[in-house]
């Protein structure tokens, strides 16, 4: 094992977790090109394809989310898979010897940061949403720092651990050279009208879009443009 910076990043399940995780990894590599980064995800989930495509190594755990209702007998299997994942990721952490573990939410980050914290590895949580996820709320007591994008997150996390950093953004989005005029032309907008952008993150985007479609006629009567 080399003496270079080693970081484990864990989480996924949806793009809302995966892309911030990859952005964090890219930022670390930009600052410390020699850094070694290992991702830990959930077997069969989106991260197992997306992370290697971004150029990083990932290992998968047999972890799954709880099934509703919570008293479903199927959750016995979920609990057993979680215990199996804890054993596996404990060995992963011991072998990789990271200086820190970062959790971005999702099934795998619960087991990974649980194991890392028990082994004395400093843990950091990155919460992308204004309403904290179940996994991150569970991990809050174990985390050294909790990075958030919104105010009033003391509702979910210890105030002394919170750092308002904003959400990680992919560099290609920051590097865009598109002008306002080009954007107006691309979307076919009237520059004299007000414009509303409706955007949802990850799997929640479908619900948002369907809600807007049901109210589209009402919105159009307000003489605004919609993207």
Question: Where are the regions that the model predicts?
Answer:
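Donor-nucleotide binding loops and adjacent catalytic segments primarily
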Residues: 46, 50-54, 178-181, 185, ...
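Short amphipathic alpha-helix
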Residues: 17-28
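Active-site-proximal region of nucleotide-activated glycan assembly enzymes
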Residues: 38, 57, 117-181, 189
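Glycine-rich phosphate-binding loop signature in dinucleotide/nucleotide-binding domains
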Residues: 32, 92-97, 189-191
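Conserved nucleotide-sugar phosphate-binding/catalytic loop shared by glycosyltransferases and other
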Residues: 4-14, 30, 34-86
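Glycosyltransferases and closely related glycan-assembly transferases
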Residues: 88-101, 109-124, 137-145
């Amino acid at each position: 094992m080399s003496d270079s910076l080693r970081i484990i990043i864990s989480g996924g399940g949806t793009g809302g977790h995966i892309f911030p995780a990859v952005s964090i990894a890219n930022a670390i590599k930009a600052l410390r090109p020699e850094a070694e980064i290992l991702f830990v995800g959930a077997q069969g989930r989106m991260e197992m394809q997306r992370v290697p495509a971004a150029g990083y190594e990932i290992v998968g755990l047999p972890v799954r989310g709880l099934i509703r209702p919570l008293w479903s007998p199927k959750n016995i299997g979920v609990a057993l898979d979680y215990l199996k994942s804890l054993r596996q990721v404990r060995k992963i952490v011991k072998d990789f010897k990271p200086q820190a573990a970062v959790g971005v939410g999702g099934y795998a980050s619960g087991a990974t940061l649980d194991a890392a914290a028990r082994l004395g590895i400093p843990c950091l949580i990155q919460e992308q949403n204004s309403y904290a996820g179940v996994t991150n709320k569970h991990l809050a007591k174990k985390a050294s720092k909790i990075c958030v994008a919104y105010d009033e997150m003391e509702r979910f996390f210890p105030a002394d651990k919170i750092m308002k950093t904003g959400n990680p953004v992919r560099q290609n989005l920051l590097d865009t050279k598109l002008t306002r005029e080009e954007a107006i032309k691309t979307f076919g907008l009237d520059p004299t009208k007000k414009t509303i952008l409706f955007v949802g993150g990850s799997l929640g985007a479908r619900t948002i879009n369907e809600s807007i479609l049901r109210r589209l006629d009402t919105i159009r009567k307000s003489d605004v443009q919609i993207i």
